[in-house]
């Protein structure tokens, strides 16, 4: 599963490079380029809670097979249209959005499956290991995507991404989900069950102050930090390497930094609190954003992206551990869905806003304001400390859960 997932993520990152770079060649302003990130992230915001409720109610294996098949089909259509030369900005955004829909349904089920495979003591290591494969793919995929696109075309990259989903589908076909001993059976999926499950998830989130801290601080970081991800292809095209290979290398440096961040996260968590790790990560990511705005030397920017990858990984993994540890098992997918909604929604909205600012005032100003916002957002830590321990569900929800209506 780990290797199949990594191969699929390599394909996804290859697609990210190809889609963003293709948009720089067919669009006339920074906004459509930034909207590629919005089209990728917005589906998670729109589908996150229903997807989490469904993931708590149905066989996750079948759900994951469906979502992987959906993404395979969307990537294949995108590849065929690109090879035929009939793809425009809105078609590219629409099919990227379709891929995001599959990812939005896939995310909560995948995240909720991780804690079922390991003990609570091993959860942080498992989250980091899952992030390692994702970020190894992030390090390899962009550079590989840039090279393949330079040697052939975006359409070939999109088709390779479609093929990458096959491995996960084959592995999922052999996987059988194991329910923890003593847990209730899932009820048959129906509209009332999904609505009830969604209401329970929202009730848990509203009633748990410790979860508020995770959501608010994740949203602030994701919103402010989205400028770097959205503007990187624009800056690369206009003032740095000017090639898809160069963009792939810079995006790969972010991924390589994330691998380093995953490797050092466990010792950091033994020595420092969650809040201190997040503060350091946010500050370093602000420095990386500032470097992208002001530095015009490719090697220096590559080093800054490496540091930015370390920063993004340590901060986001810390948020993720807190989000996965807090909810009880029977509510976990729904609570994680809200967390992923906040993360992806802030990323989507932020990308659009930073792209609009870049189009009106300039890319450099957009990045500078983003860096300042990252630093200003650290003030939230004084009022919203993070906690990596389980938070009990309200008694009325516990009674409903013991009734077995939602597994």
How would you label these PLM feature ranges?
Residues 1-407:
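Alpha-helical transmembrane-bundle signature of multi-pass membrane transport and export proteins
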């Amino acid at each position: 599963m780990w290797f199949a997932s990594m191969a699929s993520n390599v394909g996804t990152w290859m697609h990210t490079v190809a889609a963003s770079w293709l948009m720089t060649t067919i669009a006339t302003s920074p906004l459509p380029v930034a909207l590629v990130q919005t089209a990728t992230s917005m589906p998670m915001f729109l589908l996150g809670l229903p997807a989490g409720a469904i993931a708590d109610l149905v066989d996750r294996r079948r759900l994951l097979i469906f979502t992987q098949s959906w993404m395979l089909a969307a990537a294949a259509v995108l590849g065929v249209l690109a090879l035929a030369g009939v793809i425009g900005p809105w078609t590219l955004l629409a099919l990227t959005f379709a891929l995001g829909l599959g990812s939005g349904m896939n995310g909560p089920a995948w995240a909720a499956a991780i804690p079922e495979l390991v003990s609570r003591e091993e959860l942080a290591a498992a989250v980091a290991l899952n992030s390692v494969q994702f970020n190894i793919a992030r390090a390899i995929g962009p550079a590989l995507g840039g090279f393949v696109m330079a040697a052939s075309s975006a359409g070939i990259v999109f088709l390779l991404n479609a093929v990458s989903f096959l491995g996960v589908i084959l592995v999922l076909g052999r996987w059988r989900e194991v329910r923890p001993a003593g847990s209730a059976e899932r009820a048959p999926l129906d509209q009332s069950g999904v609505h009830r499950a969604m209401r329970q998830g929202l009730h848990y989130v509203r009633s748990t102050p410790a979860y508020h801290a995770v959501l608010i601080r994740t949203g602030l970081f994701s919103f402010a930090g989205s400028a770097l991800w959205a503007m990187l292809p624009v800056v690369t095209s206009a003032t740095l390497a000017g090639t898809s290979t160069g963009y792939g290398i810079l995006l790969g440096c972010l991924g390589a930094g994330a691998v380093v961040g995953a490797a050092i996260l466990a010792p950091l968590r033994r020595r420092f609190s969650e809040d201190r790790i997040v503060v350091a990560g946010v500050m370093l990511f602000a420095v990386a954003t500032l470097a992208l705005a002001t530095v015009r030397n490719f090697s220096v920017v590559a080093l800054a992206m490496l540091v930015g990858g370390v920063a993004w990984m340590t901060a986001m993994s810390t948020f993720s551990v807190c989000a996965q540890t807090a909810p009880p098992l029977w509510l976990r997918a729904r609570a994680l869905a809200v967390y992923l909604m906040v993360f992806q929604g802030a990323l989507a909205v932020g990308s659009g806003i930073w792209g609009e600012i870049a189009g009106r005032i300039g890319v450099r100003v957009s990045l500078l304001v983003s860096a300042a916002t990252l630093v200003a957002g650290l003030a939230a830590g004084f009022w919203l400390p993070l906690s990596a321990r389980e938070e009990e569900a309200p008694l009325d929800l516990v009674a409903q859960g013991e009734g077995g209506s939602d597994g």
